[in-house]
C-alpha cells in the first residue's frame, strides 16, 4: 500500500513539474517592432522572473563584403524589406574556433567557422524596457574575442532596462 502511494505521489509530482516547465518558456512566441521603413518580427528567447527577453536577429547594416565587394568600404543596403523575419541568428564573422566555441557549440578547436556575410546587428530588449513609454538608453557592444571566440548573437549581457545592440 505504501509503495503504491509513493508511486502515485511521484507521478503527480512529475506531471506538475512538466506542466510548470512547459508554460515557463515558449521559444516559438514572436514579437514585432516597427521602424520608419520596416517591421521586424523577432522572437522571445527566455523568460526570467516573468520578464521576457525579446530578440531581433540579423538586421543588416551593410551589403555583405563578398565577391567584388571584398576589401572595399561597406556599401549601403538600399531600401530594406518592408517586413523582415528577425528570428534566426545570423552568420558569425570568420574566425578560428576556440575552447569556448568547442565547449558551448561543439566546434573543434582551430576549426575555421563563420562566413564573410556577417554584417548584421542583433537587438535584445527586456519586456519591461519594451513596454516603457520613454526613450531608453541603447548599449552598443562590439564583441571582443581576438577573432577566436564570440559573436554578435551572444545573449549573456542582456538583462537590463535598456536596448542592447550587438555587432
Tell me what each language-model feature is.
Residues 2, 15, 88-91:
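Glycine-centered signal
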Residues 22-167:
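Non-catalytic accessory segments of hydrolases
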